[in-house]
């Protein structure tokens, strides 16, 4: 019998791939036509952790009878804009998924939402890290999000100059900088690797030492990588699925992520994998030159895996 994978790892030896901006945007695009204009007639919250610290019974009562006016997204948050100036802010975290009209309740069902047209939405989450927060009023929504996420990469304000201001003075490796949701919303491990490769920047290079030209390339590469992920309807490496249970295809288009030992698509040299701060990181060190030892962030632990 093969050894079981550690609880928080996939069998490939990487930390599980969390849904990032493209995966959440894919879910939004699939759910919006089904939900917008529909009334919620029944809600069953089966896991009290989903609404913690709020009482799930109180949240259920407030959701019943609400009209879904819009389904939007902020970073990795899926936002249901409801009648009565209410907002349901959902985060899938590690293993959360939203399914539309499954024949049967899947294992690990945590929430059931019944609509007035007879359809239903099921939230499943094996690891139970996902959350659902109901807030009242746009100011409360904005404050909740502002405390947790930074700029939206597809907003007009996300320019190379804005990225320069965010990175100024920061000695952390640029990959760690990209993963900080309080600065740039929605970029996770997959799209950070893909963006850095597109920009020709090594993940260990200190964020605050990037030149203006590098920052301009990085800004464009972030947008391009995220747009490619959306076009492919997300990456289904571990748990991510569409609302009908289908898989995304971006994992078949990775340039470097999870391609250790394979040839670089640009130069043909083998892609390397590092473990940096516990995160699997993929790089072509010919196309993304490693920073000199003196310029590498001091606090970063790096383990090479070929």
Label the model's feature ranges.
Residues 13-17, 88-198, 206:
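Phosphate/anion-contacting hairpin/loop surfaces
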Residues 37, 65, 148-151, 200:
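Glycine-centered secondary-structure boundary/capping sites
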Residues 39-59, 72, 100, 108, ...:
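Basic, nucleic-acid-binding surfaces and adjacent catalytic neighborhoods in DNA/RNA-processing proteins
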Residues 18-21, 153, 157, 211-219:
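Generic detection of long, well-ordered alpha-helical segments
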Residues 14-130, 263, 279-306:
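A cross-family signal for N-terminal binding/gating loops and helix N-caps
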């Amino acid at each position: 019998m093969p050894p079981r994978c550690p609880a928080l790892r996939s069998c490939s030896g990487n930390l599980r791939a969390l849904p990032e901006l493209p995966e959440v945007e894919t879910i939004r695009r699939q759910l919006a036509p089904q939900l917008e204009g529909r009334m919620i007639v029944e809600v069953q919250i089966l896991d009290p952790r989903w609404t913690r610290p709020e009482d799930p019974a109180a949240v259920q009562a407030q959701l019943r009878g609400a009209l879904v006016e819009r389904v939007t997204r902020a970073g990795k948050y899926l936002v249901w804009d409801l009648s009565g100036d209410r907002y349901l802010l959902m985060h899938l975290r590690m293993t959360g998924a939203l399914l539309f009209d499954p024949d049967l309740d899947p294992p690990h069902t945590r929430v059931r939402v019944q609509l007035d047209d007879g359809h239903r939405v099921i939230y499943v989450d094996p690891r139970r890290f996902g959350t659902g927060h109901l807030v009242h009023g746009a100011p409360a929504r904005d404050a909740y999000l502002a405390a947790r996420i930074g700029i939206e990469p597809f907003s007009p304000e996300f320019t190379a100059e804005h990225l320069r201001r965010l990175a100024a003075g920061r000695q952390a490796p640029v990959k760690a900088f990209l993963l900080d949701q309080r600065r740039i919303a929605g970029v996770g491990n997959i799209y950070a690797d893909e963006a850095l490769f597109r920009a020709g920047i090594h993940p260990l290079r200190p964020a605050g030492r990037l030149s203006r030209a590098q920052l301009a390339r990085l800004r464009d590469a972030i947008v391009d990588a995220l747009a490619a992920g959306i076009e492919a309807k997300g990456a289904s490496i571990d748990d991510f699925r569409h609302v009908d249970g289908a898989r995304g295809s971006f994992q078949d288009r990775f340039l470097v992520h999870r391609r250790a030992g394979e040839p670089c698509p640009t130069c043909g040299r083998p892609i390397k994998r590092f473990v940096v701060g516990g995160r699997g990181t993929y790089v072509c060190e010919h196309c993304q030159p490693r920073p000199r030892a003196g310029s590498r962030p001091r606090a970063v632990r790096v383990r090479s895996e070929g």
